[in-house]
């Protein structure tokens, strides 16, 4: 099983500080016994090497256990994805003890979402849960989830994902070596900026951070904004320093990463869904013994069902936490929201050939039932 690594990482910090002390003044270091300097250097180098080489994580597992490394980019205790990943880790390590062990690497400590899929194909990580926008280079089908106002609410999203159309999308990257295991909800997206946003025209001329998605670029351009592609880990600093003026995200992300602290306020638009696809290397999955694979997938599906059912409550709690912390939350009337819909809906036609008109029709049919 996986051991507690706090002492291990504290040693890295101590050795790092010792080294930094030698260069504190930017010139010749203060006096050290050379033998001691070399000891510090070698210890720091060896320990740091262990920390950054992903394969060394196997040393924390019992001999003979299958190692499952799960890399994601969020925190572990306030974010729907982080909470789900931690629960999955706990259940795998409890129920598959002796057969498999899982270690979760949150907050981009192992890979960010832009690099994790390539690492997965190379066998350096077994599980990841990037946002659906991150799969553009592998398939265009998931673009339907980025189209603004495509889904009425989270219930419509879930119904579409559970449909034959949504389930078929899980297999859409098999020819590229990736297998989707299931969708994890974050929630509906909201808009925030350095100025109040009540109409799309308020975003005219502003720089908005977007994920690497052509759909989201077109969405921001439809408002007259300037889209800026930026990694999730860089967003807070970008907003704080004025590199970008605004962003779109869920309540969990806005609160968990404290984006509301460096924005004028957040407008409750519910204009899109931010969900994740839990994905694995298909060769790794198929290479597991049947009993191991079946138990792993059973646990995964149970965690997915439980956490997706609770994701709405998590987001609402984070929305309230923003208000309690002094953040501004602006709601729209039905008439105000329709102005946003009218401004963004033309984006659909630009991506019909990628998404499929039949899939758009299926999504709208589901909207009517939800």
Predicted regions and their residues:
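Short, low-complexity disordered leader/linker segments with a strong preference
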Residues: 1-67, 370
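N-terminal secretory/targeting leader peptides
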Residues: 34, 60-156, 165-167, 173-370
């Amino acid at each position: 099983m996986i051991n507690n690594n706090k002492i291990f990482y504290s040693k890295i910090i101590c050795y790092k500080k010792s080294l930094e002390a030698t260069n504190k003044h930017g010139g010749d270091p203060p006096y050290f016994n050379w033998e001691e300097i070399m000891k510090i250097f070698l210890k720091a180098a060896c320990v740091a090497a262990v920390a950054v080489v992903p394969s060394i994580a196997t040393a924390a597992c019992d001999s003979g256990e299958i190692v499952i490394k799960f890399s994601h980019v969020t925190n572990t205790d306030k974010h729907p994805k982080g909470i789900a990943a931690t629960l999955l880790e706990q259940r795998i390590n409890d129920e598959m003890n002796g057969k498999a062990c899982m270690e979760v690497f949150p907050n981009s400590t192992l890979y960010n979402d832009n690099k994790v899929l390539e690492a997965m194909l190379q066998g350096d990580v077994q599980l990841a849960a990037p946002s659906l926008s991150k799969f553009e280079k592998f398939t265009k089908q998931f673009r339907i989830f980025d189209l603004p106002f495509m889904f009425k609410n989270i219930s419509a999203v879930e119904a579409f994902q559970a449909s034959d159309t949504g389930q078929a999308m899980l297999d859409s990257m098999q020819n590229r070596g990736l297998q989707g295991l299931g969708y994890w909800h974050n929630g509906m997206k909201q808009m925030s900026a350095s100025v109040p946003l009540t109409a799309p025209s308020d975003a005219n001329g502003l720089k908005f951070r977007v994920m690497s998605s052509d759909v989201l670029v077109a969405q921001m351009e439809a408002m007259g904004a300037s889209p800026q592609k930026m990694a999730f880990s860089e967003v807070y600093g970008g907003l704080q320093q004025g590199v970008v003026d605004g962003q779109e995200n869920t309540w969990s992300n806005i609160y968990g990463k404290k984006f509301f602290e460096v924005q004028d306020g957040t407008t409750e638009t519910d204009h899109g869904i931010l969900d994740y696809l839990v994905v694995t290397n298909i060769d790794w999955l198929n290479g597991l013994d049947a009993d191991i694979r079946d138990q792993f997938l059973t646990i995964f599906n149970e965690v997915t069902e439980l956490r997706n059912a609770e994701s709405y409550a998590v987001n609402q709690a984070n929305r309230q936490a923003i208000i309690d912390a002094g953040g501004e939350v602006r709601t729209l009337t039905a008439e105000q929201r329709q102005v946003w819909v009218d401004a963004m809906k033309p984006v659909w036609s630009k991506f019909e050939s990628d998404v499929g008109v039949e899939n758009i029709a299926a999504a709208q049919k589901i909207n009517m039932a939800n």
